[in-house]
Amino acid sequence: VAGEGQISSFQALMSAIASTVGMGNIAGVAIAITVGGPGAIFWMWVSAVVGMSTKFFEGALAIMYKGHDSAGEPQGGTMYIILHGLGERWKPFAYFFAVVGLIGTLCVMQANQLVESVTTVLTTPAGIENTLGLRFVMGIVISLVVGAVISGGIRRISVISAKIVPVMVTCYMLLVFVILCLNFDKLPGVLASIFQSAFSLEAGIGGILGTALTGARRAAYVNEAGVGTASMMHGASRNDNPIREGLVAMIGPAIDSGLVCTLTAFPILIA
């Protein structure tokens, strides 16, 4: 159903996934397995299911309580949900979320991991010294590319995300499937280790809780369910049906924490 907005529901979903699928799905999963063991993956799945319900309310409320920016364009987000849903007396919390959200969405970790990956895969094998100047140049390049995208506003971000994200996820899936096919005989052992570690009686209640907390924390960090960032994208959707937009938003954690993180975990456990 067409309504007031700037982008389609699909573009909103792809933009939300674009902000979550990335370095966290690789480095975050590796950290979760290192700290919590293979069982952390099971609790990431559980957290993904819980995150889907949270994302439903984010998407639905973003459509129910839209606002307009200074240019008169329809916008959505947690700040508008607080302002229009809870009332004027909660307005300070809307400002608080806007400021904290701006700080929390800084891409410091992602940029650092991207530079580390480039230097490890490309520059170091080529004999290029990993200096501060090289990292600075890479940072400038990343800033220019990102700046070229976000300068076009939410419309350009959504259009580019809708084109890149499906290709990115599909290519990642195909590469992982190749690894899994080459190591098919090890998959039963990997699955067994995940469930055994998740409910290991040898580790005791403390060990199970530690594994569960590690998996849940990493999943929440990766899919951003409940953080409030996805509502900004879904609030800009032209869809005027809150329930339908909420159902679309639920796909995000399923792809992010459910699919991509699992595809990352299996090769790590096989190795």
Summary of predicted features, one role per range:
Residues 34-71, 261:
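Extracellular loop-to-transmembrane helix junctions
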Residues 78, 149-166, 186-192, 223-255:
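Hydrophobic, small-residue-rich membrane helices and short re-entrant helix-turn-helix hairpins
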Residues 1-3, 34-35, 60-102, 107-139, ...:
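Inter-helical loop and helix-membrane interface segments of multi-pass membrane transporters/permeases
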Residues 115-118, 134-182, 187, 191-195:
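Membrane-interface loop-to-helix entry segments
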Residues 29-36, 62-67, 180, 219-224, ...:
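Helix-loop junctions at the membrane interface of multi-pass solute transporters
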Residues 1-26, 88, 238-240:
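Membrane-interface "cap" regions at the ends of multi-pass membrane proteins
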